[in-house]
Amino acid sequence: MTPAITAGLLHELVTHSHAEGITALDVEAVIEHDDRVLLIAEPGPDFTDDTWQLPAGPVLPGQTLTDALHPAVAAIGLTIDEITGYLGHHDHPGAHATTRVFCFTVTVTDPEAICRAAMHGHRWADPGDLPDPFHPAAWRWPATGPGGAARQ
């Protein structure tokens, strides 16, 4: 069971992160449709092989975690209908700072709009092929990962 998303929970998550010295925050969206999870192809470092990731984006100054989900999902041509749950977080150490990534489940108004947008490689992956849902950082594979080539 995922915790209810309340203003108190969102405030606590950010406050706890800042108390740990982590101020760079991102969000990820788990979007399910027809019992599959949406993964987006992102170019690898230095234009190496793509990796498969959940739709994600930064939390900008003045945004709540849930505010930041909307532009992250809109960037791939989808619109959030409802934010349905909070799954947890994971940290990404970087060269200058650690980024904390918060993972939420969402529903979207028209899941097939991603097909019409065609600006991103994507795939709808079987959740059984995915690692532990509480560690979405592990949901990144080379383009040869689960499901084969990107569906455009």
Feature roles, as predicted:
Residues 67-70, 74-78, 82, 87-90:
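Helix-adjacent hinge/juxtasegments
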Residues 103-105, 113-147:
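NUDIX/MutT-family hydrolases
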Residues 80-82, 89-113:
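Active-site-adjacent beta-strand/loop module that shapes the phosphate/pyrophosphate-binding cleft
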Residues 1-28:
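Acidic, metal-coordinating catalytic segment for phosphate/diphosphate chemistry
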